[in-house]
């Protein structure tokens, strides 16, 4: 593929890491942040000390705080803001010429919609979109360590272009047309990572964590199937791959947040210690609302949501799960 200009909207750790990857393989990459001071610091230090310290920017990675200019200058636009800011960004930007891709994992907190539904209401149901997900920590992608991702799209031509844009020796990209499944995996796995962190924070050991991962996978699969997703998606990179990674490795901010809660650190202090958005905290209520609407039982997610809203404490949430009536697996 000829080298392109990419607008990466969102300069957190994940958006920055993917921007570094795209710039390293030759694409001019515009890294947008809403904060002019953050942009000035990145431009001065040629890195992102706030969210991805110690990894220098390639020369063709350019920080910017001009949202409209970034979009209008780019061949391809990728959104990497937290889910609660996604609607605001899509409402502000002009319609991208090629389509719109995003790295964001979550659902819209105001409407409980999938992000693809928000984009369809803004730019039309036939507008090309792509969701990029899978087991991937920012530092490892930025350091060119081997990574495999899933790229789901509603448009095969746009999907092919995005595949060519991302695919490289260190990143293998698998294709999917299951937008619903890939998006749900990305949202639910963060809630389950909080649960696994809490379990480890309470000192419950490997058996409990394995049970949470396995039963959590069953929960997210049930929800996905009720909404038209495909079961194989949940057994792939975006599903079990990302779930296992996020639940077991302390690079996961959702898992670290859960660890703190399991050690009885108050929620505001735990968020402060993490220092970045904890998507699982923001998405728990939304996922439970979607599950309730679709009449799907998600007991692990429900207990985490109750804990986050002060209804139960960590030990009580575990007791509630363990005392549920016996049932077939």
UniProtKB/Swiss-Prot annotation:
- Localization (cell): Cytoplasm
Predominant place of localization: cytoplasm
Keyword NADP among record annotations:
yes
Any one Gene Ontology cellular component term annotated for this protein: cytosol
- Renumbered to this chain, the signal peptide range is none
Q: According to the lineage, what is the superkingdom? A: Bacteria
Q: Is Ligase found in the keyword set?
A: no
Q: Active site annotated at which positions?
A: 189 (proton acceptor)
Sorted alphabetically, the Gene Ontology BP terms of this entry are: carbohydrate metabolic process; glycerol-3-phosphate biosynthetic process; glycerol-3-phosphate catabolic process; glycerophospholipid biosynthetic process
The pathway noted for it is: Membrane lipid metabolism; glycerophospholipid metabolism
Q: Where does sn-glycerol 3-phosphate bind?
A: 105, 134, 136, 189, 242, 252-254
> According to its UniProt entry, what is the function of this protein?
Catalyzes the reduction of the glycolytic intermediate dihydroxyacetone phosphate (DHAP) to sn-glycerol 3-phosphate (G3P), the key precursor for phospholipid synthesis.
In its UniProt entry, what is this protein called?
A: Glycerol-3-phosphate dehydrogenase [NAD(P)+]
Q: Which organism is it from?
A: Legionella pneumophila (strain Corby)
